[in-house]
């Protein structure tokens, strides 16, 4: 295939900085195996495939906001899990504290 150039990709994005962000995010998606290439990847590495997809107009800056929304949802879920874990830890500590008091009372009585 012909070489993909930055100039060709810039026709589809605002500037070079946005191009880097979009290409990096897409390459990470491809390399992690969570997403399939939208073009025939052949033997190209994920970075090249990402740039080819941008050049073809298949991937744009919306990929960045989609990831942000998913990250926010995961963050909210993590906060709920953290609060559940914290309450379990507090319950465990309160039981341990009661056991310790009972042990101390038993020692005094002996």
Swiss-Prot record:
Top-level enzyme category: transferase
GO CC aspect terms: DNA-directed RNA polymerase complex
Record keywords, A-Z: DNA-directed RNA polymerase, Nucleotidyltransferase, Transcription, Transferase
Keyword Nucleotidyltransferase tagged: yes
Reactions catalysed, as given in the entry: RNA(n) + a ribonucleoside 5'-triphosphate = RNA(n+1) + diphosphate
EC number assigned by the record: 2.7.7.6
Single Gene Ontology MF annotation: DNA binding
UniProt-listed GO biological process terms: DNA-templated transcription
Domain of life: Bacteria
Family: Belongs to the RNA polymerase subunit omega family.
Function, as annotated: Promotes RNA polymerase assembly. Latches the N- and C-terminal regions of the beta' subunit thereby facilitating its interaction with the beta and alpha subunits.
Subunit architecture: The RNAP catalytic core consists of 2 alpha, 1 beta, 1 beta' and 1 omega subunit. When a sigma factor is associated with the core the holoenzyme is formed, which can initiate transcription.
NCBIfam families: rpoZ
Protein name in the entry: DNA-directed RNA polymerase subunit omega
Encoding gene (name): rpoZ
């Amino acid at each position: 295939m012909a070489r993909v150039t930055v100039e060709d990709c810039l026709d589809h994005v605002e500037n070079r900085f946005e191009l880097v962000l979009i290409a990096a995010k897409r390459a990470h998606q491809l390399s992690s195996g969570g997403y399939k290439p939208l073009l025939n990847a052949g033997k190209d590495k994920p970075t090249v495939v990402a740039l080819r997809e941008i050049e073809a107009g298949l991937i744009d800056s919306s990929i960045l906001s989609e990831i942000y929304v998913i990250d926010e949802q995961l963050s909210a879920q993590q906060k709920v899990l953290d609060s559940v874990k914290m309450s379990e830890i507090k319950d465990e500590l309160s039981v341990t504290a009661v056991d310790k008091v009972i042990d101390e009372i038993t020692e005094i009585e002996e």
